[in-house]
Amino acid sequence: GVNARHMGLEFEVKARPAKWVEISAMLSLGSWKWDSDSVVGYAYDGYGQALAVDPATKMTYITDPGAADHQYAIINMKGINVGGSAQTTANLGVTFKPFKGFRIGAEYTLYDRNYAYYSFSGSNLAIGKTMNLLQPWRIPTAGQLDMRASYHFQIGGLNATLSGNINNLLNQ
């Protein structure tokens, strides 16, 4: 099996310094690393059938899963960062309520220590060999500014809300 260790701390705070304003902040600090070495990956064809190779002819043939001749590769990945999600995230937001029913706000989110997602296939594994996984590419630090507004009102005795969002306002 492949194991990963996900450790970290998360903090979140919300304040209302005045009746008409809310401020929120969040910080998430993580350490996500693969915790496995000598992981065995078996070879299968596109139909999910276990593969073996005849040593004399080098021809591939179908075998039983887990049989002695079932082809495999070994992957060492202990201590390598898990990719696909920022391991440090921070957020600061503010919402204003200038009059009854109306809200307008913005929030900025910072993403750091984000590593590229990766996967394995037959093109990057050598059957019968050991592959030592290298650290994935660290994506540059990035941020995103989002804005939102909403107006809550009644129409014909029913509650209604008109709202809009602009995600990634700065197009970064």
What are these regions (language model features)?
Residues 31, 109-126, 140, 144, ...:
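C-terminal beta-signal and adjacent terminal beta-strands/loops
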Residues 131-132, 138, 142:
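Aromatic-anchored helix/helix-loop segment that forms the rim or "lid"
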Residues 46-47, 125-132:
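Solvent-exposed, glycine/polar-rich loop segments of beta-barrel outer-membrane systems
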Residues 9, 74, 129, 161-162:
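Short, functionally important structural connectors and interaction interfaces within domains
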